[in-house]
Amino acid sequence: MAKEELIEFGGVVSEALPDNRYRVLLENGVEIWAYASGKMQKHRIRILAGDRVTLEMSPYDLTKGRINFRHKS
């Protein structure tokens, strides 16, 4: 079975929550829950409220996502 294509979005972190979880406001105005990807956790990349991020979402659940890049401010 082939791996499903992920949908990529941009957004701004509105709130940092415990356990590497974040509330992100997407460019289209929808607010979702997101978590930091494994490489970001491994390299201890800090994500704070107000950071611009790129995240991936599954086409099956558009309420959760995985942050895979933090843009430089």
UniProtKB/Swiss-Prot annotation:
Protein location: Cytoplasm
CDD domains with a match to the protein in the record: S1_IF1 (cd04451)
Molecular function terms from GO: ribosome binding; rRNA binding; translation initiation factor activity
A Pfam family hit: eIF-1a
InterPro entries: NA-bd_OB-fold, RNA-binding_domain_S1_IF1, TIF_IF1
Keyword line: Cytoplasm, Initiation factor, Protein biosynthesis, RNA-binding, rRNA-binding
Gene Ontology CC annotation, any one: cytosol
Protein origin, superkingdom: Bacteria
Gene3D superfamilies documented for this protein: Nucleic acid-binding proteins
Span of domain S1-like: 1-72
Family label: Belongs to the IF-1 family.
Subunit annotation: Component of the 30S ribosomal translation pre-initiation complex which assembles on the 30S ribosome in the order IF-2 and IF-3, IF-1 and N-formylmethionyl-tRNA(fMet); mRNA recruitment can occur at any time during PIC assembly.
Protein purpose: One of the essential components for the initiation of protein synthesis. Stabilizes the binding of IF-2 and IF-3 on the 30S subunit to which N-formylmethionyl-tRNA(fMet) subsequently binds. Helps modulate mRNA selection, yielding the 30S pre-initiation complex (PIC). Upon addition of the 50S ribosomal subunit IF-1, IF-2 and IF-3 are released leaving the mature 70S translation initiation complex.
Protein name: Translation initiation factor IF-1 1
Gene transcribed to yield this protein: infA1
